[in-house]
Design a protein with these regions (language model features):
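Peripheral, non-catalytic segments that deliver or gate enzyme domains
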Residues: 1-240
């Protein structure tokens, strides 16, 4: 964005030659998701109201006029985005407004992407599905004002079971996945907490790394490789 309009233009540059190899793709949201084979990128186009309502697939090196529309949101109130799942098996398309969401998915190896609906949108219901270790995790506020996390083995029959139950006055956050671990957050009594669960044993414990009573923890996965037992943690507090 060179005008401050937040309509972003995408350029693709080849690292070896430093040459721009694709004609500019204009009026996008700025986000890019690469295919695993690096042959394609997925991006969203902005409409005249500055809402991302269309997801396109662009084949690198081809004309932009050949870009394939793979998803379009019909509601002017909703915006869309696309991302790769943590286990790199699926692409998830998220469409939402301020208090309602809906999600679609398709496999990374689909030559002709055909997004499939996970759950029909319901006014006031927010949900976000992620996949890891042959399971699907749903972070949702359906029948759970402060959210919960459900789990299922398949998105076809969707036999959801409770993974992290809703609790009074506890805000349940989402999950970060590693090969052997699931790290999640929650907030209670205005304090943020991190918990780590061993996938094999199911044992979960709180991550505490400060003697201070009030602090805000955070987690960041700097490396792409999730086959690790190490993560980068940080925190801030009135003292630190």
């Amino acid at each position: 964005d060179t005008k401050g309009s937040e309509y972003y233009t995408i350029f693709i540059r080849e690292i070896k030659t430093n040459n721009v190899i694709t004609k500019e793709i204009s009026e996008t949201s700025g986000g890019i998701t690469f295919s695993l084979d690096d042959k394609y990128i997925f991006y969203s186009k902005l409409d005249e109201n500055h809402r991302a309502r269309k997801i396109f697939r662009h084949e690198i090196g081809k004309l932009n006029s050949e870009d394939e529309l793979i998803f379009e949101e019909k509601s002017e109130a909703f915006t869309v985005s696309i991302g790769l799942s943590s286990d790199e098996k699926y692409y998830f398309i998220n469409t939402s407004d301020h208090n309602t969401s809906e999600q679609y998915y398709f496999g990374v190896n689909e030559k002709k992407p055909s997004p499939k609906l996970i759950m029909q949108r319901e006014r006031g219901v927010i949900y976000s599905v992620s996949s890891w270790d042959n399971k699907f995790y749903n972070h949702t506020n359906k029948n759970a004002e402060d959210f919960k996390i459900d789990v299922t083995d398949s998105l076809l029959d969707q036999k959801w079971e409770t993974f992290i139950p809703a609790r009074n006055e506890v805000l349940i956050g989402g999950c970060t996945f590693l090969k052997n671990w699931i790290i999640r957050s929650e907030t209670s009594n205005a304090l943020d907490k991190l918990f780590v669960r061993n996938i094999s044993s199911g044992i979960e414990e709180e991550l505490r790394f400060s003697d201070e009573k009030v602090y805000v923890p955070g987690i960041s996965l700097i490396q792409k490789d999730r086959d690790t037992d190490e993560v980068h943690l940080g925190y801030s507090s009135p003292k630190t």
